[in-house]
Amino acid sequence: MEITFQDFEKLSLRIGKITSAEKIPGMKKILKVQVDVGERLATAIAGGAEFYEAASFIGKRVVVLTNMEPKTIAGVKSEVMLLAADFEGKPVWLTVDQDVPVGTKVR
């Protein structure tokens, strides 16, 4: 399915910094993370808890979709989406290798 450039422009992709990450009771594959996206702290659900320790997320600068409709997952309201590549069934978070300020727009 193709999208138009105008559709792409509707996406608010930003650099976010993960400030906290914790296991969700009863859940083995997802974590609750707090992400600083510049104008606010937002909650997200991140997959991969069976591959990564929660502490390994903290401090990472990741690419985040900030204007997605919130969705409640496992009783947690997820307000943004962290972007990841799916490599051999394992999420690999899209990160930046420089100290890019949180809230910076991704184009």
Question: Residue spans of the language-model regions?
Answer:
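Phosphate-backbone binding interfaces of nucleic-acid-interacting proteins
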Residues: M1-R107
